[in-house]
């Protein structure tokens, strides 16, 4: 009886240690990141990751977000994530206030793949793991770029989105939700692709995405790929790479049949009318 007690205590200690053991993940900059076994305090400095965390029902684990979330996702996004109204904002896509960040005691910080290396290093020097998200699967020399050169855009973004969702789900222990989201994305895309299978190239709707200051998305950006999946043709893709400013003469030359404006940029509608 008495010999059994030390063994029981040892077993409990070992079990407790195992339950709190660190784990490793590979982020989308191909960096090995060591994380606590269970994340309950995450800071999110990238809007795409924030959007996915909402869909994975992981917002109860989020204690801080990027300062430009309203600009990036639109003010009406609060309908999907009401807690955003009160969450601290210790940084943004390319900068961080390290004192404010430390005050939140995060166990992990999500950043964009194009976050400055020094920003990532500053957070890591403070002892906080950093996970970079690109939602792309690409060559190593393109991994940290905002405007990548992609040999196969469809493959890079289709597989990269799945990789990113799985990675975020793994970090936040939301694997079942991540797999369900991936399954739904695949099914919905397959449905649309089947309906557009016989659409001739010359019947695709010519479209343009208008952003503030005459900026738009060209080749290598996910926006153009979404347009193509929907049966449209991004008129800017043949002339520009990535996110760039263009001229009104460019837009007139491209002659789009439809101009899209994102809900987060309502002022652009009035600019386009002028």
Locations of the language-model features?
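Short helix-initiation/N-cap motifs at beta->coil->alpha
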Residues: 28, 87-99, 114, 136-138, ...
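Proline-aspartate-enriched helix->loop->beta-strand connector
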Residues: 90-93, 97-111, 248-264
């Amino acid at each position: 009886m008495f010999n059994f007690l030390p063994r029981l205590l040892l077993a409990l200690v070992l079990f407790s240690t195992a339950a709190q053991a660190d784990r490793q993940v590979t982020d989308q900059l191909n960096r090995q990141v060591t994380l606590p076994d269970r994340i309950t305090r995450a800071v999110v400095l990238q809007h795409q990751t924030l959007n996915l965390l909402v869909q994975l029902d992981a917002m109860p684990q989020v204690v801080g977000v990027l300062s430009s979330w309203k600009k990036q996702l639109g003010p009406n996004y609060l309908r999907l994530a009401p807690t955003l109204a009160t969450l601290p904002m210790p940084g943004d896509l390319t900068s961080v206030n390290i004192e404010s960040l430390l005050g939140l005691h995060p166990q992990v910080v999500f950043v964009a793949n194009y976050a400055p290396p020094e920003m990532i290093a500053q957070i890591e020097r403070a002892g906080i793991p950093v996970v970079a998200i690109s939602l792309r699967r690409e060559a190593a020399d393109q991994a940290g770029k905002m405007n990548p050169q992609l040999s196969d855009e469809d493959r890079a973004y289709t597989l990269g989105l799945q990789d990113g969702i799985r990675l975020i789900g793994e970090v936040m222990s939301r694997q079942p939700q991540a797999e369900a989201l991936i399954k739904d994305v695949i099914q919905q895309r397959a449905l649309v692709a089947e309906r557009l299978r016989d659409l001739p190239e010359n019947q695709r709707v010519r479209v343009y995405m208008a952003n503030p200051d005459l900026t738009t998305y060209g080749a290598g950006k996910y926006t153009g790929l979404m347009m193509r999946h929907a049966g449209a043709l991004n008129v800017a893709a043949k002339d520009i790479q990535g996110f760039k400013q263009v001229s009104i003469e460019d837009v007139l030359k491209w002659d789009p049949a439809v101009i899209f404006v994102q809900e987060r940029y309502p002022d652009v509608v009035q600019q386009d009318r002028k």
